[in-house]
Amino acid sequence: VSGGIEFNWPQHHRPSTFSPIEYTIEENEDGSKTCWVSEIDRMYGTKGMAGFTVYKDKAYIEVRGQLYNRTEVPQTFLWWANPAVEVNDYTKSIFPPDVHAVFDHGKRDVSRFPIATGVYYKMDYSEGVDISRYKNLQVPTSYMAYHSDYNFVGGYDFSVEAGILHIADHHISPGKKQWTWGNGDFGQAWDRNLTDEDGPYIELMTGVYTDNQPDFTW
C-alpha cells in the first residue's frame, strides 16, 4: 500500500485515503490532460479536490489543489502533499541551501541540518551525523525545515544518478518535510509489511500556510 501521493486533508493522514472518490478527466487546449479527483469530508462537510496535469514531452506532474468550505461556519484544515520516494543506502534528501535547522512535530525538538550534532529522536548524533542520508536514520524520524526562501525539497539517488524535486511556492506553501520509518530493524519490518516489491521509501512533503505539523488554518 505504500507509494503514490497522499493528500493530507483536512487533517494529517487523511481518514478517507482508501475510500472511493469522484473523478473527471479534462483535455486542455495545449494538449495536456488533467485528472481531477474530488471528495467531501464526512465529518465537517468541506470539499477537497486535486488536479493532476501531464504535459507532452515533460517529465513532471503538476498538481493543483482546490478546497471549498460548503458550510456556514469557518472550518479548520491543513494540506500537505505527501509523495512516497524510493530510497536505498545511496539516497540523500535535498533541502534548500538555506535550511540549517529542522524541527520535529509541534517543534518539540530541533536539530542542526544536514549534520546533526546532538540528540534527536533519542538518537545520539553528537559525533556529527549526516541525517540527510537515509542510511544514517535508524529509527522512525520526522524533520521539517525551520525556514527557507526556496521553492523545493527533493531527493537524489547516487547509485542511478537521478532524483526528484517536489516544487511548491514557498509564499503559500512554506512546509518542507521528510519522514522515514528508518533504516533499522523496525523500519525494515514496516517496509516489508507495506509493499511486496517496491522496497523502502521516504516521504518528501510540502505543506501550505505553515512549516510544521499538525498546525491548522481556517
For the regions a protein language model found, what residue spans apply to each?
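A contiguous, surface-exposed recognition patch within enzymatic or periplasmic domains that forms
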Residues: 1, 59, 70-78, 82-216
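Extended, loop-rich substrate-binding clefts of extracytoplasmic carbohydrate-active enzymes
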Residues: 3-60, 188-208, 212-214
